[in-house]
From Swiss-Prot:
The gene is pxpA. It comes from Staphylococcus aureus (strain bovine RF122 / ET3-1). CDD domains: LamB_YcsF_like (cd10787). It comes from the Bacteria. One of its GO terms (biological process) is carbohydrate metabolic process. InterPro entries: Glyco_hydro/deAcase_b/a-brl, LamB/YcsF/PxpA-like. This is 5-oxoprolinase subunit A.
Amino acid sequence: MRVDLNCDLGEAFGNYSFGGDHQIIPLITSANVACGFHAGDENVMNETVKLAKAHNVAVGAHPGLPDLKGFGRRNIDISNEEIYNLMIYQLGALQGFCRIHQVKINHVKPHGALYQMGAKDREIASVIAQAVYDFDPSLVLVGLANSYLISEAKNVGLITASEVFADRRYEDDGQLVSRKESDAVITDTDEALKQVLKMVKENKVISKNNKEVTLQADTICVHGDGEHALLFVSKIREILMKEGIDIQSL
């Protein structure tokens, strides 16, 4: 049994810094690097790619909506053409830094509202998947397990990775509980570990209404901006190794 452990990183910009990227990267297998629209900038992207390479961590693009104020977590009325173009733009930005550091982009995981829009809307998911395929058909598209991001990526011929979350609660239909709700984020370490083991070993998660939901767990996400990110990543890695589960990049 194997699973990838990923984290959204490189989300500082300008004079604003947060997250424990330097402490987290040695513990994960895949880094999703912000590409400048929701967070990150040219200096942070460069440093994050260097850091990932130094620790042999797979580099992935983490493109988001152009919304620094809302950290890319607010829905924006945006056309399919704009979604396609912002995907290509951000992938190109990260590719530049990967090229100078002789690192290949391994995967793509949309961020925040863009991720949720693609998970719930087949047409948007198709646009996202097509952009990734047109940029590089060898890239892995990471998306919410059982969502349109996964099905539409498969339809265009991409390799997919079904993602599960250590620090988020689930609805009965397998979607994530909205961050607008007070119980959306898991902050208790034991609860997070229990959820991770059930998802990885049983391919199931218990929803907020105590319903058992079936899902595939190819990669586990911990949000790098979370208050308990470093602790969660450390404990998840520890318990997976204790259970004999291999932690490998996508």
